[in-house]
A protein has these predicted regions:
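Glycine-centered, small-residue-biased loops immediately flanking beta-strands
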Residues: 214, 389, 445
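Active-site beta-alpha connecting loops in nucleotide-dependent enzymes
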Residues: 8-25, 35-41, 320, 344, ...
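Phosphate-binding loop of NTP-binding sites
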Residues: 3-5, 28-34, 51, 64-67, ...
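Adenine nucleotide phosphate-binding catalytic loops in nucleotide-utilizing enzymes
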Residues: 3, 9-11, 15, 50, ...
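Hydrophobic Val/Ile/Leu positions in short beta-strands of Rossmann-like dinucleotide-binding domains
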Residues: 14, 114-116, 449
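N-terminal beta-loop-helix "entrance" segment that forms/cooperates
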Residues: 31-32, 37-58, 147-151, 405
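Short acidic low-complexity segments
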Residues: 56-68, 432, 437
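Structural beta-sheet core signal
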Residues: 38, 140, 180, 218, ...
């Protein structure tokens, strides 16, 4: 990858380098031959990987960490009173947001940016897989760990870069990709966007940033995407989805042996050429993942990638960590770890569990993520667990937020009960979760962990902890 920044530029310093969005950029820079360092509050697998690549890491934020820095990169999670940000201002060291750094990298290649409330990470991974299978060797910066790479980033030598775009703070409008994807738009991140209109305008601005020779692919199944569609007429737009009106649509969907099979019909609005790709095999379950696959197929077809390559890529795709990931089995019970933390994501994940085996009993363990999200979507959370036979609620993972009155796991339990689900429990001490699961697990064929906080550690430790408790 050729970057128009001299190799002797000095250290790129990342404040909060262990974040999934920051680490990917750092990895691309270090692999491109630049000096990279960064700080974070604690160690992690991501930090360990960066160290193995030669990144200099500081644990803890301190003004002395930036004394060798030539530029400081921060994310929206970093407050302006962070000692490293304060010191950089004193020393007149340039400070840029991660979106600006990502935008600089994207200027040097043709780029595909994937935005949306849900499905971004999986769609980014799928598009990358198709391009890789077509020997296009893309550079990748993703918002999750791609299983086949064991990383969220890859430095490729090809002409294309595929990135996950973050709509949470509106910064994705700075990216100016060649190709854009919108998977869906739900009322999320209103702490920044404030209201529905601002959120919709942010997506319109994102699409408006693509050049006249680029294009955008949008999921026409989603009502809010349909709503902004009339504002997108000055760009080339391709629609995909399950809707009969989609340009790229799935048909004849069946589930067999824990895989999805479907056909895709494609209506090319430019040359009026219509054709069908038959019998696509895909190992990720759920209609939401069919939509993610359709997004990647729409991009591939527009880039003139052959259907046989598309089919091969989807057949061989082995997923993304924490996206409906089967991580282990305890006796007869499958253990699934999923990042779902929004009601729509939870409904989609629980619906997919029924596709593993229709008569399986499902135990859902949910850790609410952020008090503000629980408050803003409380009624939706109360009604999204219908496909779980039993629900156990951990305490809210605050993610730095202050407590909100009448907005905890006990309140959610009462709400879920009021919506008609009687088999729900909230726990006082999260440390008791293994003992609680041990008493219940023999009654269930599937246990699924849902949440964006540290619940993934509980999921990954479950089998070992149950074996210890059973002795």
């Amino acid at each position: 990858m050729i970057i128009n920044i001299p190799k002797n530029f000095g250290f790129f310093h990342f404040v909060g380098i262990g974040g999934i969005g920051m680490s990917g950029i750092a990895e691309i820079l270090i692999k491109s031959g630049y000096e990279v360092q960064g700080s974070d509050v604690s160690s992690s697998k991501i930090i360990d990987r960066l160290i193995s690549l030669g990144v200099k890491i500081f644990i803890g934020h301190d003004k002395n960490n930036i004394k060798n820095a030539s530029i400081v990169v921060y994310s929206s999670a970093i407050k302006q009173n962070n000692p490293e940000i304060v010191e950089a201002k004193k020393l007149f060291i340039p400070i840029i947001h991660r979106s600006e750094m990502l935008s600089e990298l994207m200027k040097l290649k043709k780029s595909i940016a994937i935005a949306g409330t849900h499905g971004k990470t999986t769609t980014t991974s799928l598009i990358s897989k198709i391009l890789d299978t077509n020997k296009m060797d893309p550079t990748i910066i993703n918002g999750g760990i791609i299983s086949s790479l064991a990383s969220n980033a890859k430095l490729g030598q090809g002409q294309w870069m595929v990135v996950e775009a973050d709509e949470s703070d509106g910064s994705f409008s700075k990216l100016m990709p060649t190709v854009a994807v919108i998977t869906n738009i739900d009322l999320e991140h209103l702490d920044f966007h404030k209201n529905e209109k601002n959120l919709e305008n942010a997506f319109i601005n994102f699409i408006s940033s693509i050049p006249f020779y680029g294009f955008c692919s949008v999921c026409i199944d989603h009502p809010r995407v349909q709503k902004i569609f009339s504002n997108l007429k000055n760009r080339k737009i391709i629609t995909y989805g399950l809707s009969p009106n989609a340009d790229v649509k799935a048909e004849n969907i069946i589930v067999k042996n824990q895989k999805m099979y479907f056909d895709v019909t494609y209506k090319n609005k430019t040359n009026k050429d219509n054709y069908t790709i038959k019998n696509i095999s895909f190992s990720m379950l759920g209609l939401h993942n069919i939509q993610n696959a359709l997004a990647s197929i729409s991009i591939a077809l527009e880039l003139n990638i052959k259907p046989d390559i598309i089919k091969l890529a989807l057949k061989n795709f082995n997923g993304v960590q924490r996206r409906f990931q089967l991580i282990d089995t305890y006796k007869h019970t499958k253990i699934i770890d999923d990042y779902g933390h929004h009601p729509e994501e939870i409904k989609a994940a629980l619906s997919a569990t029924k596709l593993i085996a229709e008569k399986s009993k499902v135990l859902a363990i949910f850790q609410p993520h952020r008090y503000s999200r629980l408050k803003n979507h409380f009624n939706e959370f109360c009604s999204c667990f219908n496909d779980a036979d039993e629900v156990v609620l951990l305490n809210v993972y605050a993610a730095g937020e202050k407590r909100i009155a009448n907005c905890n796991n006990i309140d959610l339990e009462n709400g879920i009960r009021n919506y008609g689900h009687k088999n729900v429990t909230s726990i006082i001490n999260d440390e008791d979760i293994y003992k609680i699961i041990l008493k219940k697990i023999n009654n269930y064929q599937i246990i699924i962990f849902l949440g964006a906080g540290n619940i993934t550690k509980i999921a990954n430790n479950l089998k070992n902890e149950l074996e210890i408790l059973s002795k």
